Amino acid sequence: MAGCTQQISEGNRGVIMGQIKVEKNVGGIEGLCVIEPAVHGDNRGYFMETYSQRDMAEAGLDIPFVQDNQSMSVKGVLRGLHFQKNYPQTKLVRAIKGSVFDVAVDLRAGSATYGKWYGVLLTEENKKQFLIPKGFAHGFLVLSETAEFCYKCDDFYHANDEGGLAWNDPAIGIEWPDVVGTYQGSASAEGYALSDSTPLNLSGKDQLWSTISETFQF
């Protein structure tokens, strides 16, 4: 299924609301947004508002977030693709250290872009944020030596409700940057590495997820 990597140039258009610039429906997928906060810097350092409910509401994104999460991962770690089946979550994600390639896959029944993916590079330098609505699977790959990743959620984590998809499902066709390897019919990380020979590192659970066609039948 078709997908794309997020490439914002200075010429791309976005809606500026207060201290944020919002690009909506990125990749042609309704609801996905890339948010760029205004960064005020000088020779002392910088300041920015990492989240403003007022600015988000003015941009039409008034989301009642209830939980903040933070993770640290080393290079080559791939987490995903995750979703909650009965308690779907909207997520606002960003990298506060290092760099990650962050991906969302549309799982909404009846969506014109069902099965389509979109990816964006989130780094401590570009400070971009990725808003992923309910009804998407989410995952990310760490490209730096380490990365710290933060995200806001509008529902709580329910361990017994977690679902997932194979990160390398050929029907979805995510183009994970710098990953070398050949699909062997499962989500196993065996035989996969980054181009510098760093092994791809997935949890045991994430190597057991099935393909989108095996997981959903509408």
List each model region and its residues.
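Intrinsically disordered, low-complexity polyampholyte segments enriched for Lys and acidic residues
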Residues: E10-N12
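Short beta-strand His + acidic residue motifs that chelate non-heme Fe in jelly-roll/DSBH
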Residues: F130, H138-L143, Y151
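Non-catalytic, conserved peripheral segments adjacent to functional cores
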Residues: C4, G14-E125, S144-T146, C153-F218
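Cationic, low-complexity basic patches in intrinsically disordered or flexible, solvent-exposed regions
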Residues: Q7
